[in-house]
Amino acid sequence: GEINGTKLAGAYEFDNEGTPAERVVVIQEGVLKNFLMSRMPIKGFDKSNGHGRNQPGLMPTGRQGNLIVTSSQAVPEKQLRQMLIDEAKKQGKPYGLYFDDIQGGFTLTTRSLPQAFQVLPVIVYKVYADGRPDELVRGVDIVGTPLAALTRIITTGDTQHVFNGVCGAESGSVPVSAVAPAMLFSEMEVQKRAHGRERPPILPAPGADSGKDDSTGVKP
């Protein structure tokens, strides 16, 4: 399948257990309705809905294929930008952050760890409340906890955007797609991205191969 001319990497007809793929409404109007199911049952859900997926050599488990988010309160994206400026003014902030593209992210969802997520943006701008030109920002990651972040959504745009990637979990890495409109948040926690300080050595390490050879086969 495809959306707005972009093919969906997570599309498939049958899952890795041979079950036909089904469209599943997981959450509707903020209420949990269903789960992505493999053939391994859980309480209250006793059959697969075609989401048993795995990397070769690993056991299938319930995984996403194409995650599609829709909104009942959408506005044109030009209006969404103005709403970002208005929200910054309302909060007395000099600017809001506009995240134009991301390269991926990850979540911690096991019971033994804090429920948290991190998103890795590629292109981020400061959108100034006083009308100055947008300013590119580098080294910013989005962090937070899912439930707290979701309560801060003000509204969404009216255009669906596609992210294709690879998702890793206990059943390995599988291709997936996430489709969602742009979202306006009243607040979002960010942090400075860690940068490595390693530099390549100036000189080769002692005993490194020099590439020279003599007739005896012994390298100096």
Please give the residue ranges for each predicted region.
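Dual-mode signal for accessory low-complexity, basic/Gly-rich regions
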Residues: 1-220
